[in-house]
Amino acid sequence: TFASTNGRFPGLVCEYYGEPEKTKEAFHDGFYYTGDNAWRDEEGYYWFVGRCDDVIKCSGYRIGTFEVESVLMKHPAVVECAVTGAPDPVRGQVVKATIVLAKDWMPGNAELVKDIQRFVKETTAPYKYPRIVEFVETLPKTTSGKIMRKAIRANDAEKNN
């Protein structure tokens, strides 16, 4: 299991300047909640799992997107990817992979989708495989180059309405 990380120590900011609502969301009882999930091993080391808002709850399982993305990046067809949760009436959410393909790989190939799904099933726990796979030219990113998963989720919601 993993949990949300938080901290309280000298030198930590005490507020988001000029943003009281954001401050209220992030600080509780003097602790700053990072929005990250991590787990601690037997030796006391902490391991990053992913962002709290990027944890997928599928059929009672909690799936960290970072782990699934790490597996997908090992597949030869994948240059870049983002994993998000997609609403599902039975499972709550399912794993969705948005993938930028490597040169010479063609999107729209059902066999490629099956191969990617099989690869994830064989590399990590089978319930973590992406039930939805979407191929895109590029992933939305911030100016600093971080993938904007929130934009992917918003785009998916727009498509489904």
Mark where each language-model region is.
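AMP-binding/adenylate-forming catalytic core of the ANL superfamily
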Residues: 4, 9-10, 14-15, 22, ...
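Acidic/polar alpha-helix N-cap and adjacent early helical turns
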Residues: 154-161
